[in-house]
From Swiss-Prot:
Cysteine pairs bridged by disulfides in the record: 251-311, 698-712
Similarity annotation: Belongs to the G-protein coupled receptor 2 family. Adhesion G-protein coupled receptor (ADGR) subfamily.
Subunit structure: Interacts (via PDZ-binding motif) with disheveled proteins; leading to the localization of dishevelled proteins to specific membrane subdomains.
Sequence ranges of Gly residues compositional bias: 1266-1280
Region (Disordered) location: 18-45, 1157-1188, 1202-1284
Species this chain originates from: Danio rerio (Zebrafish)
Domain Ig-like: 229-327
Protein task: Orphan receptor that acts as a critical modulator of planar cell polarity during gastrulation. Controls the localization of dishevelled.
Matches recorded under SUPFAM superfamilies: Hormone receptor domain (SSF111418), Immunoglobulin (SSF48726), L domain-like (SSF52058)
Compartment list: Cell membrane
Bias-annotated ranges (Polar residues): 1157-1169
Cytoplasmic side of membrane: 761-773, 826-854, 919-977, 1027-1346
Protein name in UniProt: Adhesion G protein-coupled receptor A3
Membrane topology, record value: Multi-pass membrane protein
Length: 1346
């Protein structure tokens, strides 16, 4: 027995421990009872609170596991799936039950039985789909109930009837459907005054987000379209399967009505179960009383199953569907090749796609405006394209994408806007602003959108009068659009015909409102309406003309029609054509209505008293009447006819259009020329409403160059069609210019060619600077280009491209001519104002030569930039004016692109001309432009008598004539100025008269043509005379070119003569007073190595003369005396060579006889004779020049002026002159004879002789250093030895036989430095600068000759 008790205890104790284990795992807390605390505070009983959160319970623990006094039970955050009947029996003291955040899907009735004291119940955040009506039965003390965030969409009526103490209710759900099934709940809440916290409707969308307490019962209906809170189909994406596979489908939807059914469809056909095909369908069943589901299984899928499979939920309130596209692939699948599609929605590159698949691509431009394009999600904003089963691309859809062009997108947005009385005027103005870009329309939808908007705006035209004007302006803008775009819009949606019909309705509305007349106009469309009484009608004549309309402000239009030219009607109440007293008008068309127009209606009194509404509508061209189909009138054989006149529409409301007793005569102006003219009228009903041209009942009465008169027996749309050339444009009738223009222009071209060819062919021999040569050739070339383009291309208006090219070239050549004239004037001004050059410092390199390209950048670059910008802005600025008789720029662009720049350039040119005149008046001595001398020429010049700059020759009454060889330009500055100014003036006048000759009507054009011819002849003669005939070198070249014998003779003569030799061989020079003198040629001149005269002209090889020969030639190198007696010194031999120092006494020097520019105008009283040598020779290095000049300066202190080193005697004894002259003459003749005998056999003996040169102190005669003589080292106080005195005496005996000689040396042959640069010699006297004798630095007194 004891053993049995032990075993029983061993069995019972574990059971008690396990049964209490659940409760012991929960946390228990003591909680003071509120009722006990009030009744007996001292002896209060303790209540228990049990917390079983996060315990992973899958069901509610047994109530026995909880303490008896449990008043609060927390079972949140577990995995409880359902609440069974009697789950909380025994917890009669429980006041709070929290079961939130579990996965409860079902609650059985009686689950809360026994909880009589329960006051708060929280069932939120579960999966409760529905609640039974008796689920809360017995909870009489429940105060707060929370059912939020569950899956139920509705609550059964009477579910809260047993909750008599309920005060707070929460049942917010993302699936809550506020329909007729919740009407009872709204009424119950208001009756019981239940507090509902944050409970809002989720469906339908019309009530979404509204609080349940704010709804009225009548707003909760079941009439709205069916909206299911939950509707899912699996799979939801498109499927690609292979033949023979199995594919299951499942469909689930919220259960909202008892009669709900789930059905399956394929491509719109209901699918039934078919075991033979492997199709199985499970019956509908309700899950958790909130969802209805169905399953479809295809066990053996076949290619025929490809298509859209649809799950359809059918209820009495409506249907709802979900669709999946299925593609069944066979074993040999095909593919669509990659493709690129470009349209108004962008460019799309479709990839290689499997046959039967629909490919999707995102839109190129994302949606920027809400509510404009269908579909707001990114998935909907896609373009798709289907690849059919044959591997070919099939239908596509881009409608959900935005247009790429801004204009098209804005027009689409405007078209989608709803119009009303408040915004119609503003919308019409916006549309007018955007149609100003009509010339740039490239998409047919642009025109379609505008046509649709015009129709919408026309509905409000009766209310607002200004809308009619706006509609006319909008339609006028569309006439500037491309004809191809209008044709496509007409074919797509009858856009053009709809606009014309809308404009016709405007006129009728105006006259219907009681107005007797109405008119409006625009650049391309004119509208006129009249109320006509049949009894008083005597005929009418209406004329269409274009004129500036000051009444209305017209927006600027882009395109070929100028906004100033407005089309307008002028009507007279008579049938005859009256003279129009209208200024600055161009007649485009005229219409004559006969007096018998209303006779066909009979003579009844009612008909005679009737008032008819007549409206006239005129279009500048036929773009709004594009034929979309072929007709006999448009294509007759190989001919293709097009509208070549304005289109005029005439219509009388309520009046028959055909079979008039008297015809209507219409005169139309042709803007295009063609052949085979046909009168026609537009029939809106042809081609299935597309419209077309017909010619029945119309004939041509008269036709001339510009106008065609048509007679028709009907009231309709009138026009003339003609056969054009294959390019679709007019057959050009060439209208030549006046013969005077052609003949005189030809003469001008020949003159310009002669000047250009002469200067190019004789470029190296003509005496003109390089700059002037380039400027003259370019000036003549651009004048030639202007003349040629004007004569040959100004009237080439038949082709727009050719005409534009002519306008651009004429624009460029005109500006370039003016700029080259300015460049030439600037060059003359710089030469006139240029200062004399000084010796550069030794450390300063010579400036580099400036490129000639700078002139081309100005003369040609600026016009190219101006023309390029003008053409890039709008190429139609050139040669695109309608009916323009010549190829030139439009008026407004030409103001800023041509007339303004041309006027400014000419103004700058005139300022340069005036500045040159002022400078020449201030400095009359500046006449010529001289050559720049090289370094050797500057150091060896022997003929400079006064200051001579490299640029100017200062002219004075005593100046010597300038040799031609010293001139850089044969023309004087005044002559150059006259040439460029005269050319520019004649060119400008020629341009003006040419423009007037082609722009004016007869007979003014004849007058200006004659003036053009006279100026062309004058300009050609002026250019030839000034630049060719008036130049010695060019005359010589022309004379040589004319006669071959004479040319050969001239070459021989030129080779025998020295540059400035006279006819007898004497060399010409000038005195100080300007008297010409001669000096006979000495023996020294003819003893130059026994060479002939032609050899002396070679500029690169001179005669080798010894020092004695140079002395013998001194008779020819004596400089002339100045007018005031000041001596002019000779410094022809002033260079001292360091490398030839030993041989300097007898070294031969190579001299070349050539003229040198001299000017003997020294002022009296000057202490020194100054000279300004030019820039050093550019090919010498800086170091070479520096070392050379340094040695020269050093030896200038030490080198004596005689062989023995003795001091030369300064005073000149007059009684020794004759003896010295005789001795020196005999000596020179002997040495010349001896040199001729020995020059070819051996080297001159003087090359081997040398004499030691004693140095003298550097501070010797420091105060008498030689000054700045123009002869490079010549001093006023130069010393003369005996031989120098002889030469001076000899010069006296030959006062009129002076020769200007310049010695040029080879690189290793230098002259003798005979002047002391540091001052006069010891014990010498100063030379009187006012003496009248000619002082020269003499040669060596003694010459050693072997």
């Amino acid at each position: 027995m004891s053993v049995l008790c032990v075993l029983l205890l061993a069995f019972v104790l574990p059971l008690r421990g396990s049964s209490s284990a659940g409760s012991t795992e929960c946390k228990t807390y003591d909680e003071r009872s509120r009722s006990a605390g009030k009744s007996s505070p001292s002896g209060a009983t303790l209540d228990r609170k049990v917390v079983c959160s996060n315990m992973e319970f899958r069901q509610v623990p047994s109530p026995d596991t909880f303490p008896n006094r449990t008043v609060s039970l927390i079972l949140s955050n577990n995995k409880i799936q359902e609440l069974l009947n009697g789950s909380f029996v025994g917890l009669s003291s429980l006041e709070r039950l929290d079961i939130k955040n579990n996965i409860i899907t079902h609650i059985e009735p009686g689950a809360f039985y026994g909880l009589f004291s329960l006051k708060r119940l929280d069932l939120s955040k579960n999966l409760i789909g529905c609640l039974h009506v008796d689920v809360f039965k017995g909870l009489t003390n429940l105060v707060k109930l929370n059912l939020s965030e569950n899956k139920f969409s509705s609550l059964s009526q009477g579910i809260f009837d047993s909750l008599g103490s309920l005060k707070i209710l929460e049942f917010d759900s993302p699936y809550l459907l506020c329909d007729c099934n919740l009407q009872w709940l709204v009424v119950w809440i208001k009756e019981k005054a239940i507090g509902v916290k944050e409970t809002r409707c989720s469906f339908p969308r019309s009530l979404q987000g509204q609080l349940i307490t704010t709804l009225r019962a009548e707003t909760l209906t079941c009439d709205a379209p069916l909206e299911l809170p939950s509707f899912q189909m699996t799979p939801s994406q498109h499927q690609i399967v292979f033949q023979g596979d199995s594919l299951p489908f499942q469909c689930m939807a919220s259960f909202v009505d008892e009669d709900m059914q789930v059905l399956w469809y394929q491509d719109g056909k209901m699918v039934e179960p078919d075991a033979t095909q492997g199709i199985y369908i499970e019956k509908s069943m309700v899950q958790n009383c909130s969802l209805i589901a169905s399953a479809l299984t295809i066990s053996n899928i076949q290619p025929g199953f490809t298509g859209n499979w649809e799950c359809r939920v059918r209820t009495s309130r409506g249907n709802n569907t979900r669709t999946v596209h299925i593609v069944v692939l066979e074993s040999s699948a095909k593919y669509c090749l990659p493709d690129r599609v470009s349209n108004n929605k962008g460019e799309y590159r479709w990839p290689r796609t499997l046959a039967g698949i629909t490919a999707y691509l995102p839109c190129k431009r994302q949606v920027t405006g809400a509510g404009i394009y269908s579909g707001s999600s990114a998935e909907d904003r896609r373009a798709w394209r289907r690849c059919d089963r044959g591997g070919q691309w099939a239908e596509d859809d881009y409608s959900r994408c935005e247009y790429m062009k801004d204009v098209t997108r804005v027009l689409y947005i405007i078209n989608q806007m709803p119009l009303n009385l408040t915004n119609v005027v503003q919308t019409a103005q916006q549309l007018l602003a955007y149609t100003a870009e009509a010339p740039n329309f490239s998409d047919k939808v642009d025109v379609i959108f505008v046509a649709e908007m015009i129709e919408k705006i026309g509905k409000f035209a009766e209310k607002y009068k200004e809308l009619g004007d706006v509609m006319v302006d909008i339609s006028s803008n569309l006439l500037l659009a491309d004809e191809r775009v209008l044709w496509m819009a007409q074919r797509e949606a009858r856009a053009c015909s709809r606009m014309v019909e809308s404009l016709q309705r405007i006129a009728l509305l105006r006259v219907s409102n009681g107005a007797l007349a109405y008119s409006t106009n625009s650049p391309n469309i004119a509208l006129e309406a009249h109320a006509i009484k049949a009894s008083s009608f005597n005929g009418m004549t209406c004329t269409l003309f274009q004129k500036l309309s000051p009444e209305r402000t017209v927006m600027a239009h882009h395109g070929e029609i100028s906004p100033e030219r407005q089309l307008s009607f002028k009507c007279n109440v008579t049938s005859n054509l009256s003279a129009l007293a209208l200024k600055n008008t161009i007649v485009e068309a005229s219409l004559q209505l006969p007096p018998t127009l209303f006779s066909s209606l009979g003579s009844s009194g009612q008909a005679e008293e009737a008032v008819y509404k007549l409206h006239l509508l005129a279009f500048r061209n036929g773009k709004l009447f594009p034929p979309t189909g072929n007709s006999s009138i448009l294509s007759d054989g190989s001919k293709r006819r097009s509208v070549v006149t304005p289109v005029m529409i005439t219509k009388i409301e309520g009046f028959p259009l055909r079979d008039l007793l008297s015809p209507v005569n219409v005169t139309l102006r042709r803007f295009l020329q063609g052949s085979d003219a046909v009168p026609a009228f537009w029939n809106f009903s042809l081609q299935g409403g597309q419209g077309g041209w017909q010619s029945d009942g119309c004939r041509i009465l008269h036709q001339d160059d510009n106008f065609t008169t048509v007679s028709c027996h009907s009231l309709n749309s009138y026009a003339v069609l003609m056969d054009l050339n294959r390019t679709g444009y007019n057959v050009f009738i060439f209208r030549p210019l006046h013969p005077v223009i052609y003949s005189t222009a030809l003469v001008l071209v020949l003159c310009l060619l002669s000047v250009i060819v002469s200067y190019i062919y004789h470029h190296k021999s003509v005496r003109i600077s390089k700059k002037c040569w380039h400027m003259l050739v370019n000036l003549c070339l651009h004048i030639l280009l202007t003349c040629a383009v004007f004569v040959g291309g100004i009237n080439q208006t038949y082709n727009a491209s050719v005409c534009q090219a002519m306008g651009i070239v004429l624009h460029y050549s005109t500006l370039a001519t003016a700029l080259w004239s300015g460049v030439t004037a600037r060059n003359i001004y710089k030469q006139v104002t240029r200062k004399a050059k000084r010796y550069e410092e030794l450390d300063e390199p010579p400036p580099p030569p400036r490129p000639m390209l700078r002139f081309y950048l100005i003369g040609g670059g600026i016009p190219i930039i101006v023309c390029g910008i003008t053409a890039a802005a709008n190429i139609k600025n050139y040669g695109s004016q309608v009916n323009a008789p010549y190829c030139w720029m439009a008026w407004e662009p030409s103001l800023g692109a041509f007339y303004g720049p041309a006027a400014f350039i000419v103004f700058v040119d005139c300022m340069y001309f005036l500045s040159i005149l002022i400078q020449l008046r201030r400095h009359p001595e500046r006449r010529f432009e001289l050559k720049e001398q090289s370094e050797e020429q500057q150091h060896l010049s022997v003929t400079e008598a006064t200051e001579i700059t490299p640029v100017h020759l200062e002219s004075s009454p005593t100046a010597q004539p300038v040799p031609m060889s010293a001139l850089e330009n044969e023309h004087t500055f005044v002559s150059q100025l006259m040439g460029v100014a005269g050319s520019l003036t004649l060119y400008a006048a020629l341009w003006v008269f040419g423009a007037l000759a082609i722009s004016q009507e007869h007979p003014a054009d004849l007058v200006f043509a004659c003036l053009f011819g006279a100026l062309a002849l004058g300009l050609g003669a002026f250019l030839v005379a000034h630049h060719c005939v008036n130049r010695q070198d060019m005359r010589r070249h022309w004379s040589q070119a004319c006669c071959l014998i004479r040319r050969n003779y001239a070459v021989q003569v030129d080779s025998l003569l020295l540059p400035i030799a006279g006819s007898s061989g004497s060399v010409m020079t000038s005195r100080g007073n300007g008297e010409a003198t001669k000096c006979p040629a000495s023996s020294a001149e003819s003893s130059c190595t026994n060479k002939s005269a032609p050899s002396l002209r070679n500029s690169t090889q001179g005669c080798k003369l010894t020092n004695l020969q140079v002395e013998a030639a001194q008779c020819k190198v004596v400089a002339p005396s100045t007018a005031n007696g000041t001596a002019v010194l000779d410094n022809s031999l002033t260079e001292h060579s360091v490398d030839n120092e030993i041989k300097m006494h007898v070294a031969p020097i190579e001299i070349q006889y050539r003229p040198s520019s001299v000017n003997n105008n020294n002022l009296p009283g000057n202490a020194n004779i100054t000279g300004h040598p030019g820039r050093h020779h550019k090919n010498r290095s800086r170091a070479h020049r520096a070392s050379r000049l340094t040695v020269l300066r050093e030896y200038s202190y030490d080198v004596p002026t005689s062989v023995e080193g003795s001091v030369q005697s300064v005073p000149n004894k007059r009684h020794h002159h004759e003896s010295l002259h005789a001795r020196n003459s005999r000596r020179a003749a002997y040495l010349a004879y001896r040199e001729r005998q020995q020059s070819q056999l051996q080297q001159d003996s003087s090359d081997a002789a040398s004499t030691s040169v004693p140095r003298r102190s550097r501070h010797f005669s420091k105060g008498t250093r030689i000054g700045n003589g123009f002869g490079h080292g010549i001093s006023n106080g130069g010393l003369l030895d005996g031989s120098e005195a002889d030469v001076t005496n000899q010069t006296k005996e030959c006062p009129k036989q002076t020769l200007t000689v310049e010695l040029e040396v080879q690189p290793k042959s230098y002259g003798l430095n005979l002047a002391c640069q540091n001052g006069s010699a010891k014990d010498s006297e100063r030379l009187n600068v006012e003496s009248s004798g000619n002082v020269k630095t003499g040669l060596w007194k003694h010459e050693t000759t072997v």
